[in-house]
Amino acid sequence: MSSQGWKGFLASVEVGIGLLGYGTVGSSVNRLLVESGDEIERATGHRLRVVRALVRDTKKERSFPPGDGVLTTDFAALRDDPDIHVVAEVMGGLDPAGRYVRELLDAGKPVVSANKQLVARDGADLFATASAAGVQLRFEASVCAAIPVVKVLRESLVVANVHRVLGIVNGTTNFILSRMERGGSYAEALAEAQELGYAEADPTDDVSGADAAAKMAILATVAFGSRVRFEDVERRGIEDVEPSHVAAAADLGMVVRLVGIATLAGGAVDVRVQPAFVDRSHALAAVDGAFNAVMLQGDAIREITLEGPGAGGIETASAVVADLVSVVGTSGTGFLQNDACWRELERLPPSDWRSGFYVHLEVADRPGVLAHAASRLAAHDVSVAQLVQRLNNGEATLELVLHETSLGELSAALREIATFPEVLRAPFALPVITERVL
């Protein structure tokens, strides 16, 4: 839509909204626009109304019926409708969602997206398309649903020089790990999450860390002003976290959480998602169940934490509507650059990443095993901060908390330790997050 088109619609009270998708989120967006229409009009001077919604099946029963003539299976009809001024993409997936968003931007229609995979993987191309067309592409709902972290980073903290982002950004895995603290296996906790609707029938994207990795790629890109792609994120899921690890964390005054960690130091960026031991004194340790939290650290802010529901139809819809209101309030073109990227930064080699670590070793209970393992750690400048040893029928479990070291040095030491004939299982290691440097 040209600037003349925007001036035309701004002369009227009603703004036409198109929806790509009318499932749980899409119907919730429409519900909010209808039920909160007066509040939106007071804030923007405009009433937002859904004109068309693209669906696969117009006959399907809907939890919030959109009205006669709104549902369509014809994308071109939505794209070319002059009464549609802004479009919300809430269908998910890469295709056809990506193709539709590109065509809408090319047609001059601002787009709001809740699609983390699309923004994380194809964001550079989409932002370039939006900029060329002179319209906005907003994506608050793609990360942490009701937590307005993208807006905070892009607007409120624009001069904060944020250099670290820590986050629990996947509610499914946080629910599973929280339930495992109360007893039970990973499989039992996953089954409960599925029964309650927190986990999909196929939970792979969640439990593998892929969902969280896409969100962290977006957050790191916005926070650091440099493109971080999904493929740049080091990723490890929670599938191999066992009740014994959760119990060991509790004994050490910690909890296990799937944590996203993005760091900018020395001109290099590292972004990763993996289970971690989190000290109970740390703010993220208190994030329970399906909730999300994002901690931002920067020169001008020290540290702030945003917490709230990270998923759900109405929560995601709330973020979509907030972006729609922002688009309308800034006349569609906006005062911010679409793309947050303004510089190129190097990627930190994964082996150079530094942290404290927890290591779990299962060995035969024989003289000298602990000393031998300690010597291998020391040979790689890895020192032990805390040790717990448990004996059971000729076997020993060693729980080690290590001072900060590089991942490369620790990995080299553990590879050597794994070759010991006394080692009964492969060493298991997770980073440790505390309020202090170990």
Place the predicted regions along the sequence by residue.
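N-terminal glycine-/serine-/threonine-rich beta1-alpha1-beta2 phosphate-ribose binding loop
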Residues: 2-107
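Low-complexity, glycine/alanine/valine/leucine- and proline-rich hydrophobic stretches
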Residues: 274-299, 313-314, 378-393
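Rossmann-like NAD(P)H-binding beta-loop-alpha module
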Residues: 131-211, 218
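A conserved regulatory-domain signal marking ACT and ACT-like small-molecule sensing domains
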Residues: 319, 324-438
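Glycine-rich phosphate/pyrophosphate-binding beta-alpha loops
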Residues: 238, 280, 302-304, 308-314
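Substrate-binding/catalytic subdomain of NAD(P)-dependent oxidoreductase enzymes
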Residues: 179-180, 188-286, 291-293
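Rossmann-fold NAD(P)-binding glycine/threonine-rich loop
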Residues: 96-107, 116-154
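A short hydrophobic/small-residue beta-strand
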Residues: 110-112, 384
